[in-house]
């Protein structure tokens, strides 16, 4: 299985375009999650982008995974960029669906100084209840979903391990829907 991060661009009128299709979209994602395909997903608080994490058997499955979604079909999602992880730290639990925006996490991205040791640090962060899931793309680039709404705290959790340079990390808020 290949784990993909899908960075999805939304329409200017995203909220209006998605609303009539929200129930069908959420039901589809929950069905894909029950089948082990969707790991997690949600939008940025401002609705300008969506990040969804899929577990697929082959790269050719990315297109139908996104383009068969009711949001894509309705024009609420306008473009997407897939990135495949070379190493991925799985979530320990399947969180319940939260659609009211109350579960805010932080996505941290940046290069790791030592990918092997950084992978252990991500596993340790998950065990400490700080990491939801995350991993590495080609070239030691990290994406980690951290269990905090504070960007400085999320960056600090990684930088304090010594396997990431604080100045090389960026963070953004993310609504962890599922």
Give, region by region, the residue ranges found by the protein language model.
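Short S/T/G/P-rich N-terminal loop/turn motif that feeds into the first structured element of a domain
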Residues: 1-39, 86-141, 149-151, 159, ...
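An amphipathic, aromatic/His-enriched active-site/gating alpha helix that lines ligand/cofactor pockets
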Residues: 31-32, 57-84, 149-177
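Helix-loop segments that flank and shape redox-cofactor active sites
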Residues: 39-46
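Short connector loops at helix/strand junctions that flank enzyme active sites
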Residues: 47-49, 77, 103
């Amino acid at each position: 299985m290949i784990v993909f991060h899908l960075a999805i661009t939304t329409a200017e009128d995203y909220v209006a375009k998605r609303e009539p299709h929200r129930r069908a979209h959420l039901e589809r994602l929950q069905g894909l999650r029950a089948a082990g395909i969707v790991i997690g997903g949600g939008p940025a608080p401002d609705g300008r982008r969506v990040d969804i994490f899929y577990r697929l058997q082959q790269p050719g499955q990315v297109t139908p995974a996104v383009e068969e979604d009711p949001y894509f079909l309705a024009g609420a999602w306008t473009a997407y960029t897939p990135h495949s992880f070379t190493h991925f730290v799985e979530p320990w639990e399947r969180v319940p669906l939260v659609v009211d925006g109350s579960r805010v996490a932080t996505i941290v991205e940046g290069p790791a100084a030592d990918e092997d040791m950084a992978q252990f640090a991500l596993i340790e962060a998950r065990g400490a209840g700080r990491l939801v899931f995350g991993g590495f793309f080609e070239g030691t680039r990290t994406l980690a979903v951290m269990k905090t709404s504070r960007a400085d705290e999320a960056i600090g959790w990684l930088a304090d391990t010594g396997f990431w340079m604080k100045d090389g990390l960026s963070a953004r808020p993310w609504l962890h829907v599922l």
